[in-house]
A protein has these predicted regions:
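A transmembrane-helix-recognition feature enriched in membrane-embedded lipid enzymes
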Residues: 1-23, 55, 72-83
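Solvent-exposed polar/charged
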Residues: 14-15, 51, 81, 106, ...
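Short gly/ser/thr-rich secondary-structure transition/capping motifs
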Residues: 15-22, 95-98, 156-157
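A generic local structural motif
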Residues: 20-25, 45-46, 73, 101-103, ...
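Residues at the C-termini of beta-strands that transition into short coil/loop
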Residues: 26, 63, 89, 151, ...
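Catalytic core of membrane glycerolipid acyltransferases/transacylases, capturing the structured
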Residues: 28-93
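Non-catalytic C-terminal accessory region of glycerolipid acyltransferases
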Residues: 98-275
Length: 275
């Protein structure tokens, strides 16, 4: 009930305000389970896609959205639960990944749509990163549900990471034809099969989105960017310290020169001796 109310209110407002364009809507089945595998550019991705679909789609969201303290945290948790989001622990705790897979399988077992971001996190720079093989592939192979590739277009320009107020512009959504992986049935624990399935899905997303592809994980890219920013900050601080040291040395030199110039005996001794 709450999902329907949120879709009617928030979804209608999003469509009216941003007017997202959609291609390939006919590729989403009218009924039955299916996995929507999308690139991830913005926090708003999980709202624009459900807004344009006639059916309910359940995404997994990071657990922090459900566990933040205070009134704001409780309201955020209630909102995400109300729109059908499922918490997933991304801290690397043992068993967390399997719990997320079980959640996805439960959604599909009910004959519903399950949404997942194979990159595992938002792209830090608008490029498409390598898909993580564990979640998507195992859910697809265990459930037998078709995987529908989805490309979100320009949502990172509407709400870049860290920006609260969105920019008014028109995003796009391209939905590809369903991918069938029944040929790999019973091979969900084979890591090479997991990699093959994930790469096939990522290639389909790449063709839809037109993004530049980077063959590393987005989490690794974020670490690299954070380390580079940290190094740049350290370099700036070192430069400031060096400038201060140079300034202090120049002041000391100027003071010494000034004091030498004011000394009445400086430079007169040799003249007296010559006389």
């Amino acid at each position: 009930v709450f999902y329907g109310a949120m879709k009617l209110s928030v979804g209608s407002a999003l469509k009216l305000t941003f007017r997202p364009w959609v291609e390939g809507l006919e590729n989403v089945p009218a009924e039955g389970p299916a996995i929507l595998a999308s690139n991830h550019l913005s926090f708003s991705d999980s709202f624009f896609l459900p807004a344009v679909l006639d059916r309910k789609v359940t995404f997994i969201a990071k657990a922090e959205y459900f566990t933040s303290p205070g009134l704001k945290g409780k309201l955020t948790a209630a909102f995400f639960k109300g729109v059908g989001q499922l918490p997933v622990d991304r801290s690397g705790v043992r068993g967390a990944g399997e719990a997320a897979i079980r959640s996805g399988l439960e959604v599909l077992a009910r004959g519903e749509l399950f949404g997942i971001y194979p990159e595992g996190t938002r792209s830090p720079d608008g490029r498409l990163y390598r898909g993580k093989p564990g979640g998507l592939a195992r859910v697809a192979l265990r459930s037998g549900a078709p995987v529908i590739p989805v490309a979100m277009i320009d949502t990172e320009k509407i709400q870049p990471p860290g920006k609260v107020v969105p920019k008014l512009m028109r995003p796009g959504i391209r939905i590809g034809k369903p991918l069938d992986f029944s040929r790999y049935q019973g091979m969900d624990n084979d890591r090479f099969i997991q990699r093959a399935v994930t790469d096939e899905v990522m290639y389909a997303i790449l063709k839809l989105s037109g993004q530049e592809y980077v063959d590393i994980y987005a989490t690794a890219a974020k670490r690299q960017l954070a380390e580079a920013a940290k190094a740049e900050k350290a370099a700036r601080e070192a430069a400031k310290t060096a400038d201060k040291a140079d300034g202090a040395a120049d002041e000391a030199t100027d003071r010494a020169a000034g004091e030498a110039g004011r000394d009445p005996g400086h430079g007169s001794g040799s003249g007296d001796k010559a006389a």
